[in-house]
């Protein structure tokens, strides 16, 4: 009926262009144009997103066509949101608009730069494994830069960390020395699973490796002999596990296993040998010093003997001169007569 009236108005306008249209006909014409415009817009969006909407409708994913239109203007990928909602709905999770994984919450996480599909996969895996994981918690972990799906998988299937890790430190064994001075080279494997509650702000694998290595070295160092460690390696692991090394970390230590123990050098014997060699060198140095002092004293005595000999030679050289002077002075004859007189008396 409206189309007939519109056609009639156009005919009147054509017959009487100067008279124009009345106000009611003009409003009707504008209304028809607006209706056609909105119908064209809706048709455009329906042709573009109708398949996604039908997929969501058939999957009971609670995604409306208006939501898809809003995503078009907010630069949100509707394929990702619809696929995520379908997966959540098929997994039997709560998709309620109030407290469930709603379309609005998925859009907000997408606009924040998060990985929506990774979060949904993690939540579904946690739900299957009966691990408590809410959407807000998973989204926060994802936005913090952690791989939430890998964290859930590690919680379900614990992974093994080598201590030390050759990829990080370049070393294959830990070196520790018992009290008797024998070096032990140990290779350890630490089984851990993710502690989702501590995943944000918790220490990483490097901290766990460092703590375990420090505890193992300390435990071996407190052993009296290396034989006790070789006989009972479990003694070390029990001590290490009792220290609570996984505190404030993103992991929970399941077990610590000694994979290999090798006996290295006898550090104590080597140190004793080095000390003995040092003492020998000191004794040799002292003996050499005493020998040098003795040689110096001998040379000094020889110098004194030579000096005394020279004095003796000088004294012997003065004897003939003294005798000659005595003959000249007649002291030798007087001395002889006096001696003869004393003899006769």
UniProtKB/Swiss-Prot annotation:
InterPro entries, alphabetized: FloA
Main location: membrane
GO cellular component, one term: plasma membrane
Phylogenetic classification of the source organism: Bacteria, Pseudomonadati, Planctomycetota, Planctomycetia, Pirellulales
Xref: NCBIfam families: PRK13665.1
Annotated keywords: Cell membrane, Membrane, Transmembrane, Transmembrane helix
Protein name, per record: Flotillin-like protein FloA 1
Parts of the chain that traverse the membrane: 26-46
Protein role: Found in functional membrane microdomains (FMM) that may be equivalent to eukaryotic membrane rafts. FMMs are highly dynamic and increase in number as cells age. Flotillins are thought to be important factors in membrane fluidity.
């Amino acid at each position: 009926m409206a189309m007939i009236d519109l056609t009639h108005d156009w005919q009147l306008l054509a017959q009487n262009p100067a008279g124009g249209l009345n106000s009611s006909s003009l409003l009707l014409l504008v209304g028809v144009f607006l209706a056609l415009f909105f119908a064209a817009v809706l048709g455009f969006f329906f042709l573009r997103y109708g398949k996604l909407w039908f997929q969501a409708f058939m999957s009971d994913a609670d995604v409306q066509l208006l939501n898809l239109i809003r995503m078009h203007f907010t630069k949100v990928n509707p394929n990702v949101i619809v696929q995520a909602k379908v997966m959540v709905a098929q997994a039997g999770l709560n998709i309620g608009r109030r407290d469930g994984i709603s379309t609005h919450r998925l859009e907000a996480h997408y606009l924040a730069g998060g990985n929506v599909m990774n979060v949904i996969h993690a939540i579904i895996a946690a739900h299957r494994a009966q691990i408590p994981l809410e959407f807000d918690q998973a989204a926060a972990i994802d936005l913090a830069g952690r791989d939430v799906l890998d964290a859930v998988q590690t919680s379900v299937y614990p992974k093994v960390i080598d201590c030390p890790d050759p990829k990080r430190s370049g070393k294959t064994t830990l070196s520790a020395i018992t009290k008797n001075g024998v070096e032990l080279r140990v290779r350890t494997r630490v089984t851990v699973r993710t502690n989702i509650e501590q995943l944000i702000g918790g220490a990483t694998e490097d901290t766990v490796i460092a703590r375990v290595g420090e505890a193992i070295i300390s435990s071996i160092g407190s052993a009296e002999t290396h034989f006790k460690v070789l006989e009972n390696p479990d003694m070390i692991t029990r001590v290490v596990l009792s220290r609570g090394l996984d505190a404030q970390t993103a992991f929970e230590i399941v077990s610590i296993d000694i994979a290999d123990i090798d006996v290295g050098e006898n550090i104590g014997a080597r140190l004793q040998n080095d000390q003995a060699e040092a003492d020998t060198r000191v004794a040799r140095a002292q003996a050499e010093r005493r020998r040098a002092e003795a040689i110096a004293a001998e040379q000094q005595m020889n110098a004194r003997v030579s000096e005394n000999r020279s004095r003796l030679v000088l004294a012997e050289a003065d004897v003939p001169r003294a005798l000659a002077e005595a003959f000249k002075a007649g002291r030798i004859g007087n001395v002889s007569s006096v001696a003869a007189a004393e003899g006769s008396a």
